[in-house]
């Protein structure tokens, strides 16, 4: 094989890798703007997922700079979004993603909300469960 043909074949092979990477497992991005809203999006890359999730966050009424990138998992797996509130008032969301099944996601949430382990919580509940394609599993 001539050097010229080798270079053409090598160039074609290298050019195919970025396209192949986009066909890999999707990830899931979570963004939260405290007291305002949030966003959840699937993406081939963290940049793609977070860009979409920030857009959703802004559409919910938050300012762009208030939309905090909180979680990225690739592959996405099953995800669970948990609301927690401290007895002194502060409240927040905890997200666990990349889990192998819905049952494990719900079990993880149950452990996170175990009041015998976190007796300072006055409220802790699952807000949403997402399947590996980013589809919501709970009615809103």
Segments (PLM) and residue ranges:
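Secreted/extracellular ectodomain signature
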Residues: 22-140
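N-terminal signal peptide c-region/cleavage motif recognized by signal peptidases
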Residues: 16-18
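Bacterial N-terminal signal peptides that target proteins for export
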Residues: 1-8
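Compositionally biased, low-complexity repeat tracts
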Residues: 7, 20-23
């Amino acid at each position: 094989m001539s050097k010229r043909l080798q270079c053409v074949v090598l160039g074609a092979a290298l050019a195919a890798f970025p396209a192949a990477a986009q066909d890999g497992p999707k990830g899931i991005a979570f963004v939260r703007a405290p007291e305002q809203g949030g966003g959840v999006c699937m993406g081939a890359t963290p940049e793609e997922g977070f860009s979409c999730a920030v857009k959703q966050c802004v559409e919910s009424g938050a300012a762009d700079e208030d939309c905090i990138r909180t979680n990225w998992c690739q592959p996405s797996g099953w995800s669970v979004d948990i609301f927690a509130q401290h007895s002194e008032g502060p409240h927040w969301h905890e997200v666990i993603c990349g889990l192998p099944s819905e049952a494990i996601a719900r079990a993880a949430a149950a452990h996170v909300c175990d009041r015998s382990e976190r007796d300072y919580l006055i409220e802790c509940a699952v807000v949403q469960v997402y399947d590996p394609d980013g589809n919501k599993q709970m009615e809103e």
